[in-house]
């Protein structure tokens, strides 16, 4: 999904729908159903990859006959390979674009959980001191309009903090990425109409100039770096003093061990927050009730004083048309297990990667979609 969007598509994906919950969803049967040596291949999101590996290991006790492999290739690859039938399950932090959905009506976007991103900075002078950043300031950094850590826009957010006079090194993903999709949504939705404001000479009108997507036309910033996957982002930020970059929350523990500092991000209500179970849940509660039947919805930059602004659905991208009933049944049962609080969405699994489970109403929508897999 290389085309980026500059219009406010969030109003299309967020408004005008009501939850269409079908009665009579059958009780989950994953515990009783077992596969006869069925092989399923997953690839895609590096954000969900650590959790997916945990799911595979745990589900092997439920269905020993299912042989499943997982790959961390990036969300764009997860979507494209699922569409091309190269894999049975693509995973993605991004939903398919409207054009992709229209061209591939047999492809489902099924939320499995809710995750988030952090913005990590490598500032040796500020170890243990939370840094405050906003969408407009990050847009300025990633456009090259804000070049130094002690620049006025950053200093204005961090009163009383002695910021280093060093050039900022922005780090971004090299490949098509759902993390890029989420991060650029945050920049897009938090910087509307800056060309009409007095700050236009300092910041950057990301919404009209760049927009969002799994791949975007990044502004050229001298000294900026690229990295592949969340693991590559973590390593690059950690070894580069004065770097900043976006990271899937499933890598939070590794970022902490590397001595990186997660920034407090400004939300719609002007509050600066870190991603916690409470702030991710608050953001989800603000927007998930607007989820349409196809479940393609932007969760970034949710309203509410307690809403962390960088969250998303984690999607399984799956075709309704499987090669045979055995494969269809194996995939369906596995996905039902993934979203069940008694299965893959148990706190013991989600807490390890700082994800939260789907709300009950959204789980019901995902069950409706899973029932279409044949």
Functional labels for PLM-detected ranges:
Residues 13-16, 299:
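Hydrophobic alpha-helical segments with strong N-terminal bias
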Residues 5, 20, 32-33:
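Intrinsically disordered, low-complexity serine/threonine-rich segments
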Residues 16-29:
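Bacterial N-terminal signal peptides
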Residues 33-374:
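Flexible loop/hinge segments at secondary-structure junctions
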Residues 1-12:
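N-terminal secretory signal peptides that target proteins for export/translocation
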């Amino acid at each position: 999904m290389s085309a980026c969007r500059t219009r406010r598509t969030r109003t299309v994906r967020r408004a005008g729908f009501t939850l269409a919950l079908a009665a009579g969803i059958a009780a989950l049967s994953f515990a009783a159903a077992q596969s006869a040596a069925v092989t399923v291949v997953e690839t895609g999101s590096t954000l969900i990859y650590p959790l997916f590996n945990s799911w595979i290991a745990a589900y092997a006790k439920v269905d020993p006959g299912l042989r499943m492999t997982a790959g961390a290739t990036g969300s764009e690859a997860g979507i494209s390979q699922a569409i091309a039938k190269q894999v049975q399950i693509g995973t993605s932090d991004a939903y398919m674009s409207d054009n992709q959905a229209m061209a591939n009506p047999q492809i489902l976007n099924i939320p499995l959980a809710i995750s988030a991103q952090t913005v990590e900075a490598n500032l040796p002078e500020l170890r243990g001191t939370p840094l405050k950043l906003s969408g407009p300031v990050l847009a300025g950094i990633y456009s090259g309009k804000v070049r130094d850590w002690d620049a006025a826009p950053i200093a204005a957010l961090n009163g009383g903090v002695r910021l280093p006079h060093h050039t900022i090194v922005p780090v971004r993903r090299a490949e098509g990425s759902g993390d890029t999709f989420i991060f650029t949504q945050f920049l897009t939705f938090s910087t509307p109409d800056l060309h009409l404001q007095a700050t236009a000479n300092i910041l950057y009108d990301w919404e009209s100039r760049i927009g969002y997507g799994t791949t975007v036309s990044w502004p050229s910033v001298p000294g900026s770096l690229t990295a592949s996957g969340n693991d590559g982002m973590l390593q690059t930020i950690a070894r580069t003093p004065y770097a900043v970059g976006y990271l899937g929350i499933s890598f939070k523990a590794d970022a902490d061990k590397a001595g990186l500092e997660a920034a407090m991000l400004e939300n719609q209500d002007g509050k600066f927050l870190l991603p916690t179970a409470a702030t991710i849940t608050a953001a989800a509660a603000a927007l998930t009730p607007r989820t349409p039947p196809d479940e393609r919805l932007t969760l970034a930059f949710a309203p509410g004083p307690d809403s962390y602004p960088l969250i998303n659905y984690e999607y399984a991208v799956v075709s309704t048309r499987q090669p045979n009933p055995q494969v269809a049944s194996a995939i369906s049962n596995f996905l039902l297990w993934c979203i069940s609080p008694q299965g893959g969405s148990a706190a013991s699994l989600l807490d390890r990667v700082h994800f939260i489970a789907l709300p009950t109403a959204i789980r019901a929508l995902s069950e409706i979609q899973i029932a279409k897999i044949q």
